[in-house]
């Protein structure tokens, strides 16, 4: 075991400890951090390396851009100019295996780079790092009992990795931070996330199939993902699936509490192609199971072929083989199932779903500043351009709802849409389903 203090690390939160910590890491094996605040720029992990942080040990991101990697340090890395993220990372694991980070705290020092109350993202004139933890084309990764806080962008990004365990991790990002995701799992295989608490300003957990053209060894498939026993508080989606042009398949999500976001469960094949043209083809999403969830979000469920108010003529990728069961949800805007005109949103089962709908004062408001009109329809659930969809033993109730609501279910151009043993109450102003 190598103690970073034996290599000259001070741990006072003022002295830059990057060189000393990197020297300890370069020795390999277990690197021990006693209590203290270790101010660091980019740290590069090697295979068979463990970072063991004692209680009270903090790796704190340097406020100086020159202490971080260059954006072209590896061909897989990227800069996202629309999101003002410049490709720098605090901890990097590139093409390595058997890496462990355990205990302590990793702090991205977001406040050193920007104050979201002073700028919008589009108006921000400065520089900020990208993902705080960056794992790329690596395998056998364990993240355990570690806090990750104050990331200036996404917190933890796993791209093209395999055999990953994320257990008892606590992620906290300040509300209002642009793109402050929790976990982004992209083109990865065999991932288990369990017993985590994530409080994120953007998506808490995002399953993606993006950037496959940048990967050197992995493909664009994200599969065999299991997420269980987590509490997620989100500014956007509790769980998001989609983004990119690869495939997402064979995923389970169970025993989750999702709170406070715009979306509880969000699946979206094509996402903002005008901003991200590489993903215009869309991600295929199949064989997905959600079970035993408590969801409290503005829009509890959104499964859509594209990010648009209206269906497109064709889809290049399918969303199919989706099951949601044993879910209790609370919302104030319209949940959506919307495919494109080729009915490539198909084979969906909703079983034992209970939704309670409140509010609705902005329903049918085309001037709402931030929510597309498709989420402001006068029904609790809107279903359009789908095929082979079953609702079984589902219930919709109302509480303190606006008179703008008209009905529980709205449908348009569906094939084989079946409801069995369902109870859909009318809102106060409703005139039929």
Q: What residue spans do the PLM features occupy?
A:
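Extracellular/periplasmic carbohydrate-active domains that bind, remodel
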Residues: 1-433
């Amino acid at each position: 075991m190598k103690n970073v203090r034996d290599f000259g690390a001070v741990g006072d939160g003022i002295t830059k400890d990057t060189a000393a910590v990197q020297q300890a890491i370069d020795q390999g094996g277990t690197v021990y951090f006693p209590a203290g605040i270790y101010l660091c720029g980019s740290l590069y992990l090697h295979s068979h390396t463990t970072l063991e942080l004692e209680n009270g040990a903090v790796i704190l991101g340097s406020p100086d851009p020159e202490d971080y990697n260059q954006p072209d340090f590896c061909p897989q890395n990227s800069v996202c100019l629309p999101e003002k993220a410049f490709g720098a990372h605090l901890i990097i694991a590139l093409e390595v295996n058997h890496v462990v980070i355990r205990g302590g705290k990793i702090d991205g020092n977001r406040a050193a780079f920007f104050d979201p109350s002073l700028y919008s993202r589009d108006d921000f004139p400065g520089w900020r790092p990208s993902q705080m933890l960056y794992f790329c084309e690596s395998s056998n990764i364990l993240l355990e009992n570690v806090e990750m806080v104050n990331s200036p962008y996404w917190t933890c990004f796993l791209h093209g990795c395999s055999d990953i365990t994320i257990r008892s991790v606590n992620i906290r990002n300040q509300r209002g931070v642009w793109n402050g995701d929790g976990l982004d799992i992209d083109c990865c295989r065999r991932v288990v996330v369990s017993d985590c608490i994530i409080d994120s300003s953007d998506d808490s957990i995002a399953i993606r199939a993006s950037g496959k053209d940048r990967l050197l060894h992995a493909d664009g498939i994200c599969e065999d993902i299991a997420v269980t026993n987590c509490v997620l508080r989100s500014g956007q989606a509790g769980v998001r699936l989609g983004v990119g042009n690869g495939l997402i398949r064979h995923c389970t999500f169970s025993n989750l509490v999702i709170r406070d976001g715009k979306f509880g469960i969000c699946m979206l094949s094509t996402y903002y192609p005008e901003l991200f043209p590489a993903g215009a083809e869309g991600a295929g999403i199949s064989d997905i199971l959600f079970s035993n969830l408590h969801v409290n979000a503005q829009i509890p469920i959104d499964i859509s072929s594209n990010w648009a108010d209206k269906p497109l003529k064709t889809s290049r990728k399918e969303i199919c083989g989706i099951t949601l069961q044993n879910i209790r949800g609370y919302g104030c805007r319209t949940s959506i199932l919307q495919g494109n005109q080729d009915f490539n949103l198909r084979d969906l089962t909703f079983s034992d779903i209970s939704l309670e709908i409140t509010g609705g004062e902005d329903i049918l408001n085309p001037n709402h500043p931030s929510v597309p009109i498709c989420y402001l329809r006068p029904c609790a659930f809107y279903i359009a351009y789908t095929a082979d969809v079953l609702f079984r033993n589902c219930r919709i109730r109302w509480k303190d709802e606006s008179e703008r609501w008209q009905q529980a279910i709205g449908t348009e151009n569906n094939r084989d849409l079946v409801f069995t043993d369902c109870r859909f109450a009318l809102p106060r102003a409703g005139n039929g389903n």
